[in-house]
């Protein structure tokens, strides 16, 4: 069963990315990138993780509202392409791992800069 869930998760990720780029015309969602999908074992719910390039709290709220508004349309379009009996209910959550990764990169760059300054003294 786990293999099937993983296959469906990959299919949902691929199809939602296409739907977001081609079919959803909401300007609030132009900077959204879907990073991962996790389905329950019975495939009744799919948690969709997304990332943004901005750290603006107001923009994050607008994007979440846009995703919630487009959820029904996305689920309908998914139903036309997925090979499952019932299309999972979509739940959108912000993926902070990209933001966390860029913070780590900045900290590493800062440490390297400090090391270079110490070495030159």
From Swiss-Prot:
Domain of life from the UniProt record: Bacteria
Location(s), subcellular: Cytoplasm
Example of a GO cellular component annotation carried by this entry: cytosol
GO molecular function, one term: ribosomal small subunit binding
GO biological process, alphabetically ordered: maturation of SSU-rRNA
Pfam families: RBFA (PF02033)
Keyword Transport: no
InterPro entries hit by this protein: KH_dom-like_a/b, RbfA, RbfA_dom_sf, Ribosome-bd_factorA_CS
PROSITE patterns from the UniProt entry: RBFA
UniProt keyword annotation of Cytoplasm present: yes
Keywords carried by this UniProt record: Cytoplasm, Ribosome biogenesis
Subunit-structure text: Monomer. Binds 30S ribosomal subunits, but not 50S ribosomal subunits or 70S ribosomes.
Family indicated by similarity: Belongs to the RbfA family.
NCBIfam families recorded: PRK13818.1, rbfA
Function: One of several proteins that assist in the late maturation steps of the functional core of the 30S ribosomal subunit. Associates with free 30S ribosomal subunits (but not with 30S subunits that are part of 70S ribosomes or polysomes). Required for efficient processing of 16S rRNA. May interact with the 5'-terminal helix region of 16S rRNA.
Name of the protein in its database record: Ribosome-binding factor A
Source organism: Lactobacillus acidophilus (strain ATCC 700396 / NCK56 / N2 / NCFM)
